[in-house]
Curated annotation (Swiss-Prot):
The chain crosses the membrane at residues 27-49, 58-79, 101-120, 140-164, 206-226, 240-260, 272-292. It comes from Gallus gallus. Pfam families: 7tm_4 (PF13853). This is Olfactory receptor-like protein COR3. GO terms for molecular function: G protein-coupled receptor activity; odorant binding; olfactory receptor activity. The lineage of its organism: Eukaryota, Metazoa, Chordata, Craniata, Vertebrata. PANTHER family: OLFACTORY RECEPTOR. It is a multi-pass membrane protein. GO terms for cellular component: plasma membrane. The gene is COR3. Residues 1-26, 80-100, 165-205, 261-271 are extracellular. It is found in: Cell membrane. Belongs to the G-protein coupled receptor 1 family. Odorant receptor. Keywords: Cell membrane, Disulfide bond, G-protein coupled receptor, Glycoprotein, Membrane, Olfaction, Receptor, Sensory transduction, Transducer, Transmembrane, Transmembrane helix. InterPro entries: GPCR_Rhodpsn, GPCR_Rhodpsn_7TM, Olfact_rcpt.
Length: 318
């Protein structure tokens, strides 16, 4: 338990990824390149969807918001991580730590819910194609987006309240490259029981509800696709879901490994690698996953390139 005269620290010290001096600059260059690619690809996809009329559909509205959350939560984490490679004293203010954690939970919860909404969108498109234009109107899409951001805000508020209940009397050294809840639990001088319960219940509610919606949607999608006689029809139906399934597997697999465990099972060194994957690598991979075999995105990119550079591409104008 915390002592009665315990005061809140004004700063935390982030241990970073490694304390090996010889690795600081190489890692800085690697993650700077990854962050640059992340911003260019996600912001590029946002821009492409905004300007191309062919992509003004519910599926791409959701994808545009997914790119926004990827770019945003990578920006919440990566710049500070890059700074730790260059700074001798790797500090972050107490307020900065709280804000970083709040923003991180807000954006990752938004992504979690977006993946569920995107699964529902694919379910309606494949299982109820005739009703799709009436069900998934632009107004409905934006109401869904607004609702999921609001729910993500509430989840972030609960998590942050759990963090604010903690005291740090004996140590302010966070064994991580950003202010995540598990290393802060490790250095708390007060009981973490209530805070841990809040985080696990709130996090489980959103993660599991997202997974359940995704699973139910894909059960109905598979049952519908099996009934399609045409091989081309089956391929087209499944091809629209492949990218989403890859993104879901990467995101939810890592989140479940990271957070839906009791604190006593945490291994901070292992968690650093897992955290690195979903805070830095996944935001870079998502736009590539969704664009890799997507003919509509490729055609839109050709049209934008043709318009920007003033040349005519026969494929672009089709």
């Amino acid at each position: 338990m915390a002592s009665g005269n315990c005061t809140t620290p004004t700063t935390f010290i982030l241990s970073g990824l490694t304390d090996n001096p010889g690795l600081q600059m190489p890692l800085f260059m690697v993650f700077l390149a990854i962050y640059t690619i992340t911003l260019l690809t996600n912001l590029g996809l946002i821009r492409l969807i905004s300007v191309d009329l062919h992509l003004q559909t519910p599926m791409y509205i959701f994808l545009q918001n997914l790119s926004f959350t990827d770019a945003a939560y990578s920006t919440v984490i990566t710049p500070k991580m890059l700074a730790t490679f260059l700074e001798e004293r790797k500090t972050i203010s107490y307020v900065g730590c709280i804000l970083q954690y709040f923003s991180f939970v807000l954006l990752t919860t938004s992504e979690c819910l977006l993946l569920a909404v995107m699964a529902y969108d694919r379910y309606v498109a494949i299982c109820k194609p005739l009703l799709y234009p009436a069900i998934m109107t632009k107004a409905v899409c934006w109401r869904l987006v607004e609702s999921l951001y609001f729910l993500a805000f509430l989840n972030s508020l609960v998590h942050t309240c759990g963090l604010l209940k903690l005291s740090f009397c004996y140590s302010n050294v966070v064994n991580h490259f950003f202010c995540d809840i598990s290393p802060l639990f490790q250095i708390s001088s007060s009981s973490i029981a209530i805070s841990e319960l809040l985080v696990i219940i709130s996090g489980s509610l959103f993660v599991m509800s997202s997974i359940i919606i995704i699973l139910i949607s894909y059960v109905f999608i598979i049952l519908t696709v099996v009934m399609i006689r045409s091989k081309d029809g089956k391929y087209k139906a499944f091809s629209t879901c492949t990218s989403h399934l890859m993104a879901v597997s990467l995101f939810h697999g890592t989140v479940i490994f990271m957070y839906l465990r009791p604190v006593k099972l945490f291994s901070l060194d292992t968690d650093k690698i897992a955290s690195l994957f979903y805070t830095v690598v996944i935001p870079m991979l998502n736009p590539l996953i969704y664009s890799w075999r997507n003919k509509e995105v490729k055609d839109a990119l050709r049209r934008l390139t043709a318009t920007t550079f003033g040349f005519i591409d026969s494929k672009a104008v089709q």
